[in-house]
Structures are given as C-alpha cells and as structure tokens.
C-alpha cells in the first residue's frame, strides 16, 4: 500500500478539494487562513472535519453577497485543502478586492478574510 494519498474532488466551479492524508484524524473543526494571501491566480484554504458532517465553505463579497460555494457536502473525517482560482459560481473571474470565506457545520461556524489581487 502506498504511504501517500491524494484524493481530489471538484465540488464547485473553479475549486478543487483534496483530502490531505486519510491517516491523520483531526480532533476539532477548524478553518485555517488561506495561503498565499493576497493571492493571484489561486489560493489554498485548509479545513478540518473531526466527524462525518455536512460542511459548507462559501465566499462572500464585502456587501455580504455570496459569490461562490466551494463545498456543500457531507464530508468524512479528515484534513482537507481547497484550491480556489478566484471564480464565482458561474465560472467568471471575480474582481480584485477583499472577500470573506465562511465554514459552517452543525457544530462549527468560522469566518476569515482573503484578498484577491489582479
């Protein structure tokens, strides 16, 4: 059996979600700061799921309007990385600026900032 795993799924337009290492089990929900930040053309957003749960990760503009849904699925236990290319739900590039990304599950809610620079 291989020692490395790379499981990737495209759950949204312009976003890819990867399970980092199925052997590593997080103990609590977490949403980590994206990197790089500011970013162009893409950024990575890491999040941890300690129990099988429905999880959403969404991007909002400064007016509070949802511009992209990166994850909206039942996720197994694991540490995940989203690679996002700054596209909205229709596949169009978003303008430069500050955005918020939000993770929600039944037991967790967190919001962080990211900056897209073109």
Feature roles, as predicted:
Residues 1-2, 90:
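Short, solvent-exposed loop/turn segments at the edges of extracellular beta-sandwich modules
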Residues 2-7, 108-112:
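Extracellular and select intracellular beta-sandwich modules with Ser/Thr-enriched
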Residues 3-22:
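Short, compositionally biased serine/threonine- and acidic-rich segments at solvent-exposed termini, linkers
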Residues 11-13, 114-118:
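Short beta-strand elements
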Residues 17-35, 39-59, 69, 81-84, ...:
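Glycine-centered coil/turn sites that cap beta-strands in beta-rich domains
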Residues 46, 71-107:
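Short, surface-exposed loop/turn motifs with a glycine/proline- and acidic-biased composition
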């Amino acid at each position: 059996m291989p020692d490395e795993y790379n499981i990737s799924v495209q759950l949204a337009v312009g976003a890819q979600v990867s399970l980092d290492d199925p052997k590593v089990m997080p103990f609590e929900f977490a949403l980590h700061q994206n990197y790089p930040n500011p970013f162009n053309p893409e950024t990575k957003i890491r999040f941890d799921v300690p129990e099988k749960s429905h999880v959403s990760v969404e991007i909002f503009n400064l007016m509070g309007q949802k511009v992209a849904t990166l994850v909206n699925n039942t996720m197994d236990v694991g540490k995940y990385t989203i690679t996002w290319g700054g596209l909205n739900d229709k596949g169009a590039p978003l303008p430069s600026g500050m955005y918020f990304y939000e993770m929600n599950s039944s037991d967790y809610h967190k919001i962080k900032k990211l900056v897209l620079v073109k």
